[in-house]
Structure formats: structure tokens, C-alpha cells
Amino acid sequence: MAKLKIKKYGDPALRKRAEAVSEINEIIKELASDMLETMYSASGVGLAAPQVGILLRFCVIDVDPNKKSPIVMINPEIISGENKITAEEGCLSFPGFYGNVNRFENIIAGYTDLNGNRQEIKAQNFLAKALQHEIDHLDAKLFIDYLPDWKRESIEKKIKRKKKAGDW
């Protein structure tokens, strides 16, 4: 297992759509393991492959506070969603930045697991939000895209200052 470098906002990989995973092989399994290690070491609850520079449609998630319920989702998709709610969220690609995002409270998502089996998951609340956030990454959409212009511009301005200071 190896810890991977998380791409920060401004990296072109975050704005490119990921391609479907066509084969689940040892490379994908090892990458999933590395992504989980990276996510846990960064105190995250989700990590999408584009966030580590891999433009493939898969992500890892674990919203369990004890970090004992990892989910590896290959080619995930939202099947349905209901009851939108607004809540604060952040992102490992935006360390230290947060914003209120409107997402479905309840969703059904489909994905392929590491054994090649098609799965469906009914998710609520925090897990539902995390799934939507990670699947957005696969479509090159970031949480700041949901924010009002003034908030997004404020975050971008602060990031620009951090880059100038060498802190990004």
C-alpha cells in the first residue's frame, strides 16, 4: 500500500471527466487500496480517482467514524434521489475550505464492486451526500460549482493568495 498525492484545486485533472473502468484487475485493486490509505491518512470520508490524478470512474468512501466500512465503487451512478437539503461540505482537494451545498438527502446508487458484481446501495444523509460529492468528481464537477458566485469567488481568491505564498 502507498499513500498517493491528492490533487488540489487548480490541477487540470480535477476538471476532466473520468472514463469508465473496463476491467477490474490487480492494478485497480491496488489503486483502490492505496486510495483508501490516502483517504484515511487525510482524515477524509471519500476520495475519487481524479483527485489522485487517475481519470477512471471509481471512488472510495467510508463515513464510519471508526473507519471500518469502506466502499469501493467502480463506475458508480446515481439511480434516483429525493428530498434536497443544504448542508456544509468540504473536499480533500480544497483543504480548509467549506461551503453549503444543496444535495439529495436520500439516494439509490448503482456501482460495480471489486469482485465485478453489480451492487445497489440505498444511502441517506451523510453517506448520500458523500456519494453524490464523489460521483460529481468523476464528472469533473466540484463542490464550489454549487456555491453562490460571491462564495466561490471568495474561495478562489484565498486559494490564489495561498498559491502566491507557496502554501498550496
Swiss-Prot record:
Assigned keywords, A-Z: Hydrolase, Iron, Metal-binding, Protein biosynthesis
Matching Pfam families: Pep_deformylase
Superkingdom as given in the UniProt entry: Bacteria
GO molecular function: metal ion binding; peptide deformylase activity
Catalytic activity: N-terminal N-formyl-L-methionyl-[peptide] + H2O = N-terminal L-methionyl-[peptide] + formate
Catalytic residues as annotated in Swiss-Prot or TrEMBL: E134
Enzyme class: hydrolase
GO biological process: co-translational protein modification; translation
Annotated positions binding Fe cation: C91, H133, H137
Cofactors: Fe(2+)
InterPro entries membership: Peptide_deformylase, Peptide_deformylase_sf
Free-text remark on how the cofactor is bound: Binds 1 Fe(2+) ion.
EC numbers on record: 3.5.1.88
Role of this protein: Removes the formyl group from the N-terminal Met of newly synthesized proteins. Requires at least a dipeptide for an efficient rate of reaction. N-terminal L-methionine is a prerequisite for activity but the enzyme has broad specificity at other positions.
Annotated family: Belongs to the polypeptide deformylase family.
NCBIfam families hit by this protein: pept_deformyl, PRK00150.1-3
Name by which UniProt lists this protein: Peptide deformylase
Organism: Endomicrobium trichonymphae
Taxonomic lineage from the root: Bacteria, Pseudomonadati, Elusimicrobiota, Endomicrobiia, Endomicrobiales
Gene: def
